[in-house]
Curated annotation (Swiss-Prot):
Binds 2 Mg(2+) ion per subunit. It is found in: Cytoplasm. This is Crossover junction endodeoxyribonuclease RuvC. It comes from Rickettsia massiliae (strain Mtu5). One of its GO terms (biological process) is DNA recombination. GO terms for molecular function: crossover junction DNA endonuclease activity; DNA binding; magnesium ion binding. The lineage of its organism: Bacteria, Pseudomonadati, Pseudomonadota, Alphaproteobacteria, Rickettsiales. The gene is ruvC. Its EC number is 3.1.21.10.
């Protein structure tokens, strides 16, 4: 089972690919997709899609796991995040991948044991839980690893 974990965002999206081989979890790859806030939103969404599409084609995941979002007090920010999620979900659908969504607190609790963990705690724990993640320093990338990890360890596939 290969999971593509996604921490959705318009400015800095995190992605990660984690596999389960028998009882062993294996980190395969991760990264961030940064877009320029000065670019038109449709160009930013297209860049996110084309970059994630390359990840899907290279790693051939069976499923995508994406973090659910909360409604921010800034409605414009929430709307833009909704655009990004819609574009990502459309790509997931186009490749006929199953998809699971996880609440941020569920991911935090699964990875750290505490549903209100801070970003640095998540980063620390994924480095302990998944060999190969020691070079990750970006919290968006770490969150994507944590989302994929949550999908695999909760057997939500």
């Amino acid at each position: 089972m290969i999971i593509l974990g996604i921490d959705p965002a318009l400015g800095s999206l995190g992605w990660a690919v984690v596999a389960k081989e028998t009882a062993q979890l294996k980190y395969l790859a991760s990264g961030i997709i940064k877009t320029n806030s000065k670019d038109a939103i449709h160009h930013r969404l297209a860049f996110i899609n084309s970059t994630l599409e390359k990840v899907i084609l290279e790693y051939q995941p069976n499923m995508a796991a994406i973090e659910e979002t909360f409604v921010n007090t800034n409605s414009v920010t929430s709307l833009k995040l909704g655009y990004a999620r819609g574009a990502i979900m459309s790509l997931i659908g186009r490749y006929n991948l199953d998809m699971r969504e996880f609440k941020p607190n569920t991911v935090k609790k699964t990875v750290t044991g505490y549903g209100h963990a801070e970003k640095d705690q998540i980063l620390h724990m994924i480095k302990l839980l998944l060999p190969g993640t020691f070079l990750i320093t970006n919290s968006d990338e770490a969150d994507a690893v944590a989302i994929a990890y949550t999908c695999l360890v909760t057997k939500n596939y």
